[in-house]
Amino acid sequence: MRLLIANDDGVFAPGIRTLADTLAIAGHEVVVVCPDRERSATGHSLTVFDPIRAEVVSDRFHPRIKAWACSGTPSDCVKLALGALLEQPPDFVVSGINQGSNLGTDILYSGTVSAAMEGVIEGIPSIAISLASFTVHDFQPAADFTNRLLKALENAPLPPKVLLNVNVPALPASEIAGVVITRQGIRRYHDLFQKRVDPRGKTYYWLAGEVVEEYPQDPNQAPTDVEAIAQNLISITPLTFDLTYGQGVQDLTEWLRTVQPLFNL
């Protein structure tokens, strides 16, 4: 298959190198377009007031891989690849392997997930894959799982407009407990801004904080991605770009009937 690979950790991150090389060795036609530097937590931002530059990268990936390092955001990378760099559209966009999980509300900030979502917006099935650790650097189990997942999706394709957000425990493959389909969990942060002063006497702030994970127990629903990783399971969460709250449409329709006279329309 033709694969476009992006990330948000940048061209020198070991996760994207392991992923791209593994998929190229498996026989896929791989193109990498990723940021030229660290771009984590940039969300789905695009560069609209500056030029975007893309430089060919050599001697970083497997010899069969074409690669560019882009000055823009992760979403820029996918948009530029699809609109200008690639001769043919890919069969899949794969974003990762991210250093650190993308669970719960992380997905709203994640450049990794946003790069994959850009593919879905353009009508291309996409996968975001993350290793659930900031300190473990063995990306091979996650890369091997991605290869198997792509084979499965080739035989049984995704429905349209679906992104698979995959989180892999940072464990040897033999210690991973299995694979489960999950829903988005709750993972918040108790933010803390550290106030500091630079050498010129100017005040600045450094964002820190603690992760707060919730484990709601509901036997009538699928487990959450947060629960799955806590149980050493690979989490696969289907996402889409439609953020409409379905029940809210019905509730607000009823609400509008009650307040309609106040609008004088």
Curated annotation (Swiss-Prot):
Compartments in which it is found: Cytoplasm
Binding site for a divalent metal cation: 8-9, 40, 98
Cystine residue pairs: none
Keywords: Cytoplasm, Hydrolase, Metal-binding, Nucleotide-binding
Membrane-traversing stretches: none
The protein's required cofactors: a divalent metal cation
GO cellular component term of the entry, any: cytoplasm
A Pfam family this chain is assigned to: SurE
Enzyme class: hydrolase
Co-factor binding details: Binds 1 divalent metal cation per subunit.
Entry EC number(s): 3.1.3.5
Catalyzed reactions: a ribonucleoside 5'-phosphate + H2O = a ribonucleoside + phosphate
Gene Ontology terms, MF aspect: 3'-nucleotidase activity; 5'-nucleotidase activity; exopolyphosphatase activity; metal ion binding; nucleotide binding
Predominant location category: cytoplasm
Domain of life the protein comes from: Bacteria
Family: Belongs to the SurE nucleotidase family.
HAMAP family per record: SurE
Function: Nucleotidase that shows phosphatase activity on nucleoside 5'-monophosphates.
Entry protein name: 5'-nucleotidase SurE
Organism of provenance: Thermosynechococcus vestitus (strain NIES-2133 / IAM M-273 / BP-1)
Gene expressing this chain: surE
